[in-house]
Curated annotation (Swiss-Prot):
Subunit organization: Homodimer. Part of the FGAM synthase complex composed of 1 PurL, 1 PurQ and 2 PurS subunits.
Enzyme's top EC category: ligase
Domain of life assignment: Archaea
Catalytic activity: N(2)-formyl-N(1)-(5-phospho-beta-D-ribosyl)glycinamide + L-glutamine + ATP + H2O = 2-formamido-N(1)-(5-O-phospho-beta-D-ribosyl)acetamidine + L-glutamate + ADP + phosphate + H(+)
Function: Part of the phosphoribosylformylglycinamidine synthase complex involved in the purines biosynthetic pathway. Catalyzes the ATP-dependent conversion of formylglycinamide ribonucleotide (FGAR) and glutamine to yield formylglycinamidine ribonucleotide (FGAM) and glutamate. The FGAM synthase complex is composed of three subunits. PurQ produces an ammonia molecule by converting glutamine to glutamate. PurL transfers the ammonia molecule to FGAR to form FGAM in an ATP-dependent manner.
Protein name, as recorded: Phosphoribosylformylglycinamidine synthase subunit PurS
One annotated GO biological process: 'de novo' IMP biosynthetic process
């Protein structure tokens, strides 16, 4: 079975996010009043596995070993079986 995987990675609350701060300042200079700006990285890929459970295990391992730094990042995973 083929699965579409989406991993959304963001800094944990309280972590300094210079990219978001820069965006917020730039928007203010353009006249837009925004607050609580945050940024999120999204990684998408497909996997061919026998079961949803196998994909979940592998993606969790990927996140812990490479995609995320669990000390500073929170992440959400979305997995959908592809038709066909």
């Amino acid at each position: 079975m083929k699965f579409m995987v989406e991993v959304r990675i963001r800094l944990k609350k309280g972590m300094l996010n210079p990219e978001a701060a820069t965006i917020e300042r730039a928007l203010a200079l353009l006249g837009y009043e925004v607050e609580d700006t945050d940024t999120t990285d999204v990684i998408t890929f497909t996997m061919d596995e026998d079961s949803l459970e196998a994909v979940e295990r592998e993606v969790e391992d990927m996140c812990q070993r490479l995609l995320c730094n669990p000390v500073i990042h929170d992440y959400d995973v979305s997995i959908n079986e592809m038709e066909g």
